[in-house]
Amino acid sequence: MRHAKSSYPRGFPDHIADHDRRLAPRGVREASLAGGWLRTNVPAIEKVLCSTAMRARETLTHSGIEAPVRYTERLYRADPDTVIKEIKAISDEVTTSLIVSHEPTISAVALALTGSGTNNDAAQRISTKFPTSGIAVLNVAGRWQHLELESAELVAFHVPR
């Protein structure tokens, strides 16, 4: 999931660090819609990996998703390999996880993990644009630690509005 819409306060970027930008009112609304969609359309989330950026943390809070969270600086300005390493470190006891991160990385990760059985419409939409609050749903067979490129099935892409 990409973080929800953030605000650009007066004086940005000099006035406030990018890491500390908060959600815009639209982002608060979209994060809530995203959480509702996740609760309705995917199995219960058992683990969340979330960027330490304020907008990512606020996205998670306003989504209402309640699961153990690991906030990690590594997801802020991460490259796809770093995000995949973080996913591979998830405990095998976890069957459903949520990653709250940033663009352009989150779309690159979703597409890099996408393999056979993929929803081609969803993949095309992700490659065109991964808007704020966008959610890519992937099925991963096997253990997290064995996750490889092109090994997951992209089953849905949703943008709450």
Curated annotation (Swiss-Prot):
Class of this enzyme: hydrolase
Keyword Cell cycle applies: no
Key words of the record: Hydrolase
EC numbers for this chain: 3.1.3.-
Listed SUPFAM superfamilies: Phosphoglycerate mutase-like
SMART domains linked to this entry: PGAM (SM00855)
InterPro entries reported for this sequence: His_Pase_superF_clade-1, His_PPase_superfam
Molecular functions (GO terms): hydrolase activity
Family indicated by similarity: Belongs to the SixA phosphatase family.
Protein name as it appears in the record: Uncharacterized protein ML1117
Source species of the chain: Mycobacterium leprae (strain TN)
